[in-house]
């Protein structure tokens, strides 16, 4: 599933070139809330496209006893996570569908060091290509803006 591109592989292997011609094709996906043995469908999209994002926020590390001598990327990353919660609410219309989920965060691996960089990552999901593009763009803009406001830089 994740990155397997099943439909793409089927097309590359010639499934659409066979005789007799394919009239209908259905993609299927597990749906845990549906009872076993049931198949469900409806007109229009059912599942969203998905993309991942990875962010590195660079600051200046140092000892946690002297945070005033650092530019703390962990604080900037935490602020970015909070700010990203507004991306869908303020950029996706009420009749559209989009999700931005931050699912990863990392920084120092010890208790007394402010790291030079912190990382966050997650997924973006949307039913429409134009919504996906808007969300990708806004995630980058928001993260870079928050990083800059904290004196850091960000790579998205």
Outline where the language-model segments fall.
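A non-catalytic, amphipathic alpha-helix used as a structural packing/dimerization or gating element
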Residues: 76-79, 134-142
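A common structural junction motif
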Residues: 87-88, 140-150
């Amino acid at each position: 599933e994740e990155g397997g591109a099943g439909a793409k592989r089927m097309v590359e292997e010639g499934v659409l070139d066979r005789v007799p011609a394919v009239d209908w094709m259905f993609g299927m996906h597990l749906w845990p809330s549906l009872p076993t043995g049931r198949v469900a469908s409806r007109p229009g999209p059912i599942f969203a496209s998905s993309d991942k994002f990875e962010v590195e926020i660079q600051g200046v590390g140092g000892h946690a006893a002297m945070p005033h001598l650092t530019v703390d990327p962990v604080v900037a990353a935490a602020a970015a996570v909070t700010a990203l919660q507004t991306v869908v609410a303020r950029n996706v219309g009420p009749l559209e569908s989009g999700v931005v989920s931050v699912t990863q965060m990392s920084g120092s691996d010890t208790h007394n060091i402010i790291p030079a960089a912190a990382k966050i990552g997650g997924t973006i999901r949307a039913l429409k290509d134009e919504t996906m593009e808007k969300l990708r763009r806004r995630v980058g803009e928001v993260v870079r803006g928050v990083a800059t406001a904290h004196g850091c830089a960000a790579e998205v």
